[in-house]
Structure formats: structure tokens, C-alpha cells
């Protein structure tokens, strides 16, 4: 014989409020991450503009390193 479990349901207004807060948090986090990525890319561009050859050489392995 199967037993049914009853779970309380949240009101739709409460669900909408939680979703709105979550979307706001996500969008703020995305904006912050986008800004951080842009800063890193700008820094890489600056390094490449001033010293591209040394930058590339730093990634080349030498003799089995």
C-alpha cells in the first residue's frame, strides 16, 4: 500500500519574490565577473603591446621542461 506524503506548497507570490531576488543576485554577479574579465584582458593587451616576444617566450618549453 503506497503512502502519500503531503508537502506544504509556497504561495506563488513568495516564489516570484525569491526568483526576482535570485535573478538580481545573478545579474550583479555577472556584471562583476564581466568587469573582472575585461580588466584581465586589458592587462594582457598592455603586456602584448609592450613586450609580446618575451610574453610568448615565457610559455615556450625548453629542452624537456
From Swiss-Prot:
Residues 1-34 are annotated as: Disordered. Residues 1-13 have a biased composition (Basic and acidic residues). One of its GO terms (biological process) is proteasomal protein catabolic process. It comes from the Bacteria. GO terms for molecular function: proteasome binding; protein tag activity. There is a cross-link at residue 65 (Isoglutamyl lysine isopeptide (Glu-Lys) (interchain with K-? in acceptor proteins)). The keyword Coiled coil applies. Residues 25-49 form a coiled coil. Pathway: Protein degradation; proteasomal Pup-dependent pathway. Residues 21-59 are annotated as: ARC ATPase binding. Keywords: Coiled coil, Isopeptide bond, Ubl conjugation pathway. Strongly interacts with the proteasome-associated ATPase ARC through a hydrophobic interface; the interacting region of Pup lies in its C-terminal half. There is one Pup binding site per ARC hexamer ring. HAMAP family: Pup (MF_02106). Protein modifier that is covalently attached to lysine residues of substrate proteins, thereby targeting them for proteasomal degradation. The tagging system is termed pupylation. The N-terminal unstructured half of Pup provides a signal required to initiate unfolding and degradation by the proteasome but is not needed for pupylation, while the C-terminal helical half of Pup interacts with ARC to target proteins to the proteasome. Belongs to the prokaryotic ubiquitin-like protein family. This is Prokaryotic ubiquitin-like protein Pup. The lineage of its organism: Bacteria, Bacillati, Actinomycetota, Actinomycetes, Propionibacteriales. The gene is pup.
Amino acid at each position: 500500500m503506497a503512502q502519500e506524503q503531503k508537502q506544504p506548497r509556497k504561495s506563488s507570490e513568495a516564489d516570484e519574490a525569491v526568483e526576482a531576488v535570485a535573478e538580481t543576485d545573478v545579474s550583479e554577479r555577472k556584471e562583476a565577473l564581466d568587469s573582472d574579465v575585461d580588466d584581465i584582458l586589458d592587462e594582457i593587451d598592455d603586456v602584448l603591446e609592450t613586450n609580446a616576444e618575451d610574453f610568448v617566450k615565457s610559455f615556450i618549453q625548453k629542452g624537456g621542461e
